[in-house]
Every structure is written in structure tokens, then in C-alpha cells.
Amino acid sequence: MIEADRIISGQAKVDEDVIDRAIRPKLLADYVGQPQVREQMDIFIKAAKLRQDALDHLLIFGPPGLGKTTLANIVANEMGVNIRTTSGPVLEKAGDLAAMLTNLEPHDVLFIDEIHRLSPAIEEVLYPAMEDYQLDIMIGEGPAARSIKLDLPPFTLVGATTRAGSLTSPLRDRFGIVQRLEFYSVEDLTSIVARSAGCLNLELEQQAAFEVARRSRGTPRIANRLLRRVRDYADVRNGGVISVDVAKQALSMLDVDDAGFDYLDRKLLSAVIERFDGGPVGLDNLAAAIGEERDTIEDVLEPYLIQQGFLQRTPRGRIATSKTYRHFGLQKLSD
């Protein structure tokens, strides 16, 4: 199964961008969850505005779907500046980045998603731009080539990544602010679902919002996606009213259980229990057993399972916890 095909995937789907923009909070006051990040960014932004400076360069990292792009846009809105958006894989040539940098206005935000995928050549262009607001450009070719420096306006680079450990040290060290986004609580997700329902003019019971939230794997993007599918079900089966029973029926139809697991999650945990006696099992063996790439397990499946206490990562391998056995209604054998 391709990760992007899963309804509980934290990765963005192509057709979601327009709807996501419609329900995305614009200001910190509307931003739900991440209290420490919200408080810190409020201080940093206000201080930069008081000094009439550009905000320090900001690195945002965390699992997919937690709001990195949303936070980048909020920074630009709070600073009252423009935001230009690109991604690491798109920036193939130094000239591509140079064109974006030279078109920035003072204090503008340049947002680079998947910044860990920048090529070394692009990073070399970024270093002086981030540190000195200067751009080194080579003019000509061969022996006649020469380097000229262009001054850039003070700007804020906001980088987003799901793999902060993959950033090179020179790039990571140039970010003055580093924020990690954590999985959201069910309470915060319930508020997010209720807010999104309001933006979409949906008739949603509070308990129905809770049902969607608790199956959303701590991830706002998943919560909003499930809400849209529950809306479809309610439109067809209940005149558009999303009651708690309708929400439960819709989510059951979508094969999302009470813990927010889909077939792939259950397949992974079942493999650890049934094929490897609960573990420990090495990542390569586990990947082979369920027919998935090890990167998919490590980057997509494991973070939530570990964070929720269903899977334990040890030096010897992955181990199913007692919570996993209880979820499947099984008795854990004594060691």
C-alpha cells in the first residue's frame, strides 16, 4: 500500500490544498495546540516587530500533518509580510533559488518545505544569504568566470522537515529558532474539528467531533480529512447532520478503529505479535514480513505507535507492548 493512499496518512493529498487553505488558521490567536511553540513564537514575533527587524530564521520539524506549513503562513501573517513558498526537491539549480531571493521584499518569509532534500549546491547558496543577506553569483564560464556579491533585503527563511536529523550541521546551525511540533491531544483535536466544521458550515455534535478527534492519530490533517469523509456519509445517510452515531458509522466504514489504526497499523502490530512472538524484531525483518519499506515503518508508522505506547524501540529491535496485546484482546505471555 502506498502511504499517501491511506486515509490516516499524515501526508498531504493533491486535492486537499484548496480546502486546507480555507480552514487553516491565519493568526496565532486561532492556532490550537502546541502551547509552548505558540507562546515562544508570539514573543519572538512581537520582539522582531518592536525592533522592526526580520524574524530570525526558523526551522520547524515534526511528523507529517502537524501544521508546519500552517505555522509558516501564520508567521508571515503576524509579521505583516509576504510569503513565498517552495520545496527542497523543486530547487534543482542555484539560479532557481537566486531568483526567489532577489525578489523578496524586506522582512519577507521564504518557506522551504522538505528542506532536508536540498542539494549541496543549493545549500552553498543559502549559507551567505542566511548569514549575511548576501548572494554570491558566478558570472561567465571558465577562466573568465568571476563572482559578484548582491545584497539581499533582510528576510526570514522558514524551513520545514519531517527529518531534522538529515539536515547538514552548517544548515541547521544557521537557524536562530528551532521548533518541534508534537502530536496533538484529543482535546485539542476536538477543538480543531469543531473549528473546521464551523468553517465548512457543518452541523456537528460535540461528541461527534470527539469521535473524529480520537481516531485522528494526534494529527490535524488527518482529523480534517476524516471530518470531510464523515460529512460525505452524513450528507447521504443523515441529511447532513453529523451525530455521534453517524460519525461512528462513517469511521467504521472507513476501517479506522478506536485507536486510529487502519489495516496497515494492525498488520504491523499483528506481525510483531504473531510472527515474532511480540519481539524483539529487527526493522529489516519486520519490513519484509509486512511488505513495506523500512523507511515507511520508521518515518510514517512507528512515530505514532511509539508515542502512544503500542510499540517499543530497543537496541535489539521492536517489541509489542502490553497495550498492544490489550488492543487486540490477547493475553501477553510471560517472559
Swiss-Prot record:
<protein>
    <recommendedName>
        <fullName>Holliday junction branch migration complex subunit RuvB</fullName>
        <ecNumber>3.6.4.-</ecNumber>
    </recommendedName>
</protein>
<dbReference type="InterPro" id="IPR036388">
    <property type="entry name" value="WH-like_DNA-bd_sf"/>
</dbReference>
<feature type="binding site">
    <location>
        <position position="23"/>
    </location>
    <ligand>
        <name>ATP</name>
    </ligand>
</feature>
<comment type="similarity">
    <text>Belongs to the RuvB family.</text>
</comment>
<feature type="region of interest" description="Large ATPase domain (RuvB-L)">
    <location>
        <begin position="4"/>
        <end position="184"/>
    </location>
</feature>
<dbReference type="GO" id="GO:0006310">
    <property type="term" value="P:DNA recombination"/>
</dbReference>
<dbReference type="InterPro" id="IPR036390">
    <property type="entry name" value="WH_DNA-bd_sf"/>
</dbReference>
<feature type="binding site">
    <location>
        <position position="24"/>
    </location>
    <ligand>
        <name>ATP</name>
    </ligand>
</feature>
<dbReference type="InterPro" id="IPR003593">
    <property type="entry name" value="AAA+_ATPase"/>
</dbReference>
<dbReference type="GO" id="GO:0005524">
    <property type="term" value="F:ATP binding"/>
</dbReference>
<feature type="binding site">
    <location>
        <position position="68"/>
    </location>
    <ligand>
        <name>ATP</name>
    </ligand>
</feature>
<dbReference type="GO" id="GO:0048476">
    <property type="term" value="C:Holliday junction resolvase complex"/>
</dbReference>
<dbReference type="GO" id="GO:0009378">
    <property type="term" value="F:four-way junction helicase activity"/>
</dbReference>
<dbReference type="GO" id="GO:0000400">
    <property type="term" value="F:four-way junction DNA binding"/>
</dbReference>
<dbReference type="Pfam" id="PF17864">
    <property type="entry name" value="AAA_lid_4"/>
</dbReference>
<feature type="binding site">
    <location>
        <position position="184"/>
    </location>
    <ligand>
        <name>ATP</name>
    </ligand>
</feature>
<dbReference type="Pfam" id="PF05496">
    <property type="entry name" value="RuvB_N"/>
</dbReference>
<dbReference type="GO" id="GO:0016887">
    <property type="term" value="F:ATP hydrolysis activity"/>
</dbReference>
<dbReference type="Pfam" id="PF05491">
    <property type="entry name" value="RuvB_C"/>
</dbReference>
<keyword id="KW-0227">DNA damage</keyword>
<comment type="subunit">
    <text>Homohexamer. Forms an RuvA(8)-RuvB(12)-Holliday junction (HJ) complex. HJ DNA is sandwiched between 2 RuvA tetramers; dsDNA enters through RuvA and exits via RuvB. An RuvB hexamer assembles on each DNA strand where it exits the tetramer. Each RuvB hexamer is contacted by two RuvA subunits (via domain III) on 2 adjacent RuvB subunits; this complex drives branch migration. In the full resolvosome a probable DNA-RuvA(4)-RuvB(12)-RuvC(2) complex forms which resolves the HJ.</text>
</comment>
<keyword id="KW-0378">Hydrolase</keyword>
<feature type="binding site">
    <location>
        <position position="313"/>
    </location>
    <ligand>
        <name>DNA</name>
    </ligand>
</feature>
<dbReference type="GO" id="GO:0005737">
    <property type="term" value="C:cytoplasm"/>
</dbReference>
<feature type="binding site">
    <location>
        <position position="174"/>
    </location>
    <ligand>
        <name>ATP</name>
    </ligand>
</feature>
<keyword id="KW-0234">DNA repair</keyword>
<feature type="binding site">
    <location>
        <position position="70"/>
    </location>
    <ligand>
        <name>ATP</name>
    </ligand>
</feature>
<feature type="binding site">
    <location>
        <position position="69"/>
    </location>
    <ligand>
        <name>Mg(2+)</name>
    </ligand>
</feature>
<feature type="region of interest" description="Small ATPAse domain (RuvB-S)">
    <location>
        <begin position="185"/>
        <end position="255"/>
    </location>
</feature>
<dbReference type="InterPro" id="IPR008824">
    <property type="entry name" value="RuvB-like_N"/>
</dbReference>
<dbReference type="InterPro" id="IPR041445">
    <property type="entry name" value="AAA_lid_4"/>
</dbReference>
<keyword id="KW-0963">Cytoplasm</keyword>
<keyword id="KW-0233">DNA recombination</keyword>
<feature type="binding site">
    <location>
        <position position="65"/>
    </location>
    <ligand>
        <name>ATP</name>
    </ligand>
</feature>
<comment type="function">
    <text>The RuvA-RuvB-RuvC complex processes Holliday junction (HJ) DNA during genetic recombination and DNA repair, while the RuvA-RuvB complex plays an important role in the rescue of blocked DNA replication forks via replication fork reversal (RFR). RuvA specifically binds to HJ cruciform DNA, conferring on it an open structure. The RuvB hexamer acts as an ATP-dependent pump, pulling dsDNA into and through the RuvAB complex. RuvB forms 2 homohexamers on either side of HJ DNA bound by 1 or 2 RuvA tetramers; 4 subunits per hexamer contact DNA at a time.</text>
</comment>
<keyword id="KW-0067">ATP-binding</keyword>
<feature type="region of interest" description="Head domain (RuvB-H)">
    <location>
        <begin position="258"/>
        <end position="335"/>
    </location>
</feature>
<keyword id="KW-0238">DNA-binding</keyword>
<dbReference type="GO" id="GO:0006281">
    <property type="term" value="P:DNA repair"/>
</dbReference>
<feature type="binding site">
    <location>
        <position position="294"/>
    </location>
    <ligand>
        <name>DNA</name>
    </ligand>
</feature>
<feature type="binding site">
    <location>
        <position position="69"/>
    </location>
    <ligand>
        <name>ATP</name>
    </ligand>
</feature>
<feature type="binding site">
    <location>
        <position position="221"/>
    </location>
    <ligand>
        <name>ATP</name>
    </ligand>
</feature>
